Amino acid sequence: MNPNQKIITIGSLSLSLVVLNILLHIISITITVLVIPKNGNTGSCNETVIREYNETVRIEKITQWYNTNIIEYIEKPENDRFMNNTEPLCDAKGFAPFSKDNGIRIGSKGHVFVIREPFVSCSPTECRTFFLTQGSLVNDKHSNGTVKDRSPYRTLMSVEIGQSPNVYQARFEAVAWSATACHDGRKWMTIGVTGPDTKAVAVVHYGGVPTDVINSWAGDILRTQESSCTCIQGECYWVMTDGPANRQAQYRAFKARQGRIIGQTEISFNGGHIEECSCYPNEGKVECVCRDNWTGTNRPVLVISSDLSYRVGYLCAGLPSDTPRGEDGQFTGSCTNPMGNQGYGVKGFGFRQGNDVWMGRTISRTSRSGFEILKIRNGWVQNSKEQIKRQVVVDNSNWSGYSGSFTLPVELTRKNCLVPCFWVEMIRGRPEEKTIWTSSSSIVMCGVDHEIADWSWHDGAILPFDIDKM
């Protein structure tokens, strides 16, 4: 084959391959156009997806045209449904661990806030841990003196449940040294109390924006629950105290809708004392178990109806649940009057289960150490001492502190009842330990259909820290 023939042959083969390649592309395009419509598609694929970028949720509308994606960012639709929360409480046979933040252990080498008064509240899609920071970090010089309750540096912040109160994931909620927070199904409402003791102000936030205020009406440390408020069918309820901690004070229940106060009522409770109520929804009413800081070692009970009418008294059970307290055997109980003469006290909680009651208390009678929850038969309505269940959460060789209640809404659990849950604060540092600071972590438990073994989910931080040795 001469050179000219070789050139002609190679050229013919190349041209054939080019023609074949073009034919294959034409066949591919023809099949794509003919086949896709038969599958009910017009050649484009529209899809709306939700993507999370750190703590920001962005909704994207993605239009696919063959091999090309067109992405449009669209505004996140606002949930327009309020939570109902009129369901009864689920019956709990025991309480299983839900979360533990280990904030102080992590804080020895991590950027974790010095906190007190942590509590949990839930929306239809998540539960969050709220806490009052001291404007300082664990193991830092600014943590000195944080045993003090009220200062201009204290703020209410929150993280997703189970996270430590760290600077990277915490969300600012309000300036506050006393607080409450709850979700109505649409947005979070938070209430932060701050300012001087004689002229404190409570600022109501809704969806992160200040919407209303409550000024101190008695001029003596206006304060609120330090646990979740309660929303029922779009209306949210909470309790506030103004007045002495060791004598008769003044108490009010408030109701708000979308962050605007629409009602309040004075709670008449002569001879009784109400502080730091732990409240939850149950069958369309708000049931609260509170702290008597004046005389009673039994806990005040407040039941609030939607029209702000109320019933107030004491937890009937024949066992005391405040600290300090006397011997169980010497306590008789009362549904109407404070019993015992110990004074002081600690925030606590209880759950009504029909006529029975689950009530939490420290194991120690004299100090904030250990924690147990007891079920007392007929303890909501009678001076019963019949203890039918007991579960240890923190053993008596470890510190506890405040405790409080919240519920898991049916939107989260898909049940037809509200799951009762509680948290236990575990205070470390001053005044019981040799440190320059005071902070806490928490364990969270939720009601289940099974009995749960005793154990100690204590704080576990090894003290003192480096800052305490300087």
Where are these regions (language model features)?
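Beta-propeller fold detector
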Residues: W65, R150-T155, V167-A174, D212-D220, ...
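Short beta-strand elements that form the blades of beta-propeller/WD-repeat-like
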Residues: K61, I71, V112-F113, C127-T133, ...
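Structural motif
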Residues: G135-L156, D197-V203, N246-A253, G296-V303, ...
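Short loop/turn segments immediately following beta-strands, especially the blade-tip
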Residues: Q258, P320, I376-V381
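Alpha-helical transmembrane segments in eukaryotic/viral proteins
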Residues: I8-S16, N21-N39
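Repeated scaffold domains used in trafficking and secretory/extracellular systems
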Residues: G110-F119, A170-C182, D220-T230, G271-C279, ...
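Beta-strand-rich domains and repeat architectures in extracellular enzymes and scaffolds
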Residues: K100-E126, F131-T133
